[in-house]
From Swiss-Prot:
Organism listed in the record: Aeromonas hydrophila subsp. hydrophila (strain ATCC 7966 / DSM 30187 / BCRC 13018 / CCUG 14551 / JCM 1027 / KCTC 2358 / NCIMB 9240 / NCTC 8049)
PROSITE patterns from the UniProt entry: HEXAPEP_TRANSFERASES
Chain positions recorded as UDP-N-acetyl-alpha-D-glucosamine binding sites: 8-11, 22, 73, 78-79, 100-102, 137, 151, 166, 224, 330, 348, 363, 374
Region (Linker): 227-247
Record keywords, A-Z: Acyltransferase, Cell shape, Cell wall biogenesis/degradation, Cytoplasm, Magnesium, Metal-binding, Multifunctional enzyme, Nucleotidyltransferase, Peptidoglycan synthesis, Repeat, Transferase
Name recorded for this polypeptide: Bifunctional protein GlmU
């Protein structure tokens, strides 16, 4: 026996008013269906079947996974018809879990409880109680037992008053589900083959039906339009913010924090407002992230601070470093311990050594900077000739004066001093002072031009 997961992703999503298939619309910068696929893997899916229809080429382009079995639903004739397309791919003794590509917030823990609630010869449903159940299929019970589901358009007044609703998520035995699906008809207001009709069949066959509720109703929220998509995004971010705060992080305003990847935190991490986390980010102990900063695929060491409005991507920042405000660190940047990078500094494929400082208005690209180096304001490494990139090497204890250009390839020896306003085109030896600026001239009795009226 194995667990087969069938993910329904064939809908066009007309109300999105988009050429993009609905399940490819992003939540936290990732397609909704990708969230569902990842959750299915976490609960131990041995076979993953993705039922697709509209936008097949785009789906296969965006969702590239070797463990997916792509199942075509050529005509969208309802959820029951969609699941039935996967019948040839599961065995009678398998368990079949049905999920939906537009409900990205469902949690692995909820699905584990659902799987555990299913009797060996039974079925388990995920249901939720809503204050406003309009639009959802109602759970019909008799003497406390689930006996069926009635869709909104087919419900009578008594059934419309029911607040327990169907989420569509269920798990059943493969053989039983095969039998029930084969008996579906489309004699209903929508003219579709409803997956929900198998519940009444299961009851008629004396199949035990368990019902499980998610911890939070937001787990089963879907998106049919862009308003609901935005609501999903906020619900997702609320879940992530709460998880981080429970783990010990301080979020100055949880409602103004976006996690669009994964974040690993140490102790006493403080994150100010409007911070965006993308990719895989690791923050050490006692790290502070300033307002409006964007972090992507980076590691920040203990007791380091990123000041407001800094953008850090693909960088490694050691312990006790200071970055920003208004700093951009691009891929390949490494800051060693106690390094400081200040406002309006950009670094790319550059290393700043232990205790070195680069405080203002500087570009360091393709550069190796040693320990205890001072980089003056306005320094530029000229690393590109229009075709090729070249490296600048600055050894330990160098002092670089303001407004200096280093034309790569060039090496500055240990302890050298570069005078402000210099353009360095040749290597500099250890402990040398180099000044290349034009000598200052004094012109007496100079009269500035006067505009003619």
């Amino acid at each position: 026996m194995s667990l087969n997961v069938v993910i329904l992703a064939a809908g066009k999503g007309t109300r999105m008013r988009s050429s993009l298939p609905k399940v490819l619309h992003p939540v936290a910068n990732k397609p909704m269906v990708s969230h569902v696929i990842e959750t299915a893997r976490k609960v131990g899916a041995e076979q993953l079947h993705l039922v697709y229809g509209h936008g097949a080429e785009l789906l296969k382009e965006r969702i590239q996974a070797s463990d997916l079995n792509w199942v075509l639903q050529a005509q969208q004739l309802g959820t029951g018809h969609a699941v039935a397309q996967a019948i040839p791919f599961w065995q009678d003794e398998d368990d079949v879990l049905v999920l939906y590509g537009d409900t990205p917030l469902i949690q692995p823990e909820t699905l584990q409880r659902l799987l555990a609630a299913k009797a060996s010869d039974g079925m388990a449903l995920l249901t939720v109680v809503l204050d406003n159940p309009t639009g959802y299929g109602r759970i019909v019970r008799s003497n406390g037992q689930v006996v069926g589901i009635v869709e909104q358009k087919d419900a009578n007044a008594e059934q419309l008053a029911i607040r327990e609703v169907n989420t569509g998520v269920l798990v059943a035995n493969g053989g039983q589900l095969r039998s029930w699906l084969s008996r579906l008809d489309n004699k209903n207001a929508q003219g579709e083959f409803y997956l929900t009709d198998v519940i009444a069949m299961a009851h008629a066959d004396n199949c035990p039906i368990a019902a499980v509720h998610p911890d939070d109703a937001m787990e089963v929220e879907g998106a049919n339009n862009r308003v609901q998509l935005a609501q999903l995004e906020r619900s997702y971010q609320k879940m992530q913010a709460e998880r981080l705060m429970i783990a010990g992080a301080t979020l100055i305003d949880p409602a103004r924090f976006d996690l669009r990847g994964t974040l690993e935190i140490g102790e006493e991490v403080v994150i100010d407002v409007n911070v965006i986390i993308e990719g895989k980010v690791v923050l050490g102990n006692h790290v502070r992230i300033g307002a409006g900063s964007v972090l992507k695929d980076c590691v920040i060491g203990d007791h380091s601070e990123v000041k407001p409005y800094s953008v850090i991507e693909g960088a490694q920042i050691a312990d006790q470093c200071s970055v920003g405000p208004f700093t951009r660190l691009r891929p390949g940047t490494v800051l060693e311990q106690d390094a400081h990078v200040g406002n309006f500094v950009e670094m790319k494929k550059a290393r700043l050594g232990v205790g070195s400082k680069c405080g203002h208005l500087t570009y360091l690209g393709d550069a190796e900077v040693g320990a205890k180096v001072n980089i003056g304001a306005g320094t530029i490494t000229c690393n590109y000739d229009g075709v090729n990139k070249f490296q600048t090497i600055i050894e330990d204890d160098v002092f670089v004066g303001s407004d200096t250009q280093l034309v790569a390839p060039v090496r500055i020896g240990k302890g050298a001093t570069l005078g402000a306003g210099s353009t360095i085109t040749k290597d500099v030896a250890e402990n040398e002072l180099v000044i290349t600026r034009v000598p200052q001239r004094h012109i007496q009795n100079w009269a500035r031009p006067v505009k003619k009226k």
